[in-house]
Amino acid sequence: MSNPCQKEACAIQDCLLSHQYDDAKCAKVIDQLYICCSKFYNDNGKDSRSPCCPLPSLLELKMKQRKLTPGDS
């Protein structure tokens, strides 16, 4: 898998385009990306990288702000 979480990242782009870039209307797909990225880092280590995922430290902050846990779906 060359770009983990690419499907989720593309879903965000599609959602933002269809909602005139109102990110509040795309919260669910943004959450799905963060959950996917969390699983990616848990499975592959925090030194792994995907162009679709924020760095682990930023991801942890974003998940905390959104009250998400890695097991959410």
UniProtKB/Swiss-Prot annotation:
Disulfide bonds join C5-C36, C15-C26. InterPro entries: CMC4 (IPR027179), Cys_alpha_HP_mot_SF (IPR009069). Pfam families: CMC4. A motif (Cx9C motif 1) lies at residues 5-15. Keywords: Disulfide bond, Mitochondrion, Repeat. It is found in: Mitochondrion intermembrane space. A motif (Cx9C motif 2) lies at residues 26-36. Residues 2-44 form the CHCH domain. GO terms for cellular component: mitochondrial intermembrane space. The keyword Mitochondrion applies. The twin Cx9C motifs are involved in the recognition by the mitochondrial MIA40-ERV1 disulfide relay system and the subsequent transfer of disulfide bonds by dithiol/disulfide exchange reactions to the newly imported protein. Belongs to the CMC4 family. This is Cx9C motif-containing protein 4, mitochondrial. It comes from Saccharomyces cerevisiae (strain ATCC 204508 / S288c) (Baker's yeast). The lineage of its organism: Eukaryota, Fungi, Dikarya, Ascomycota, Saccharomycotina. The gene is CMC4.
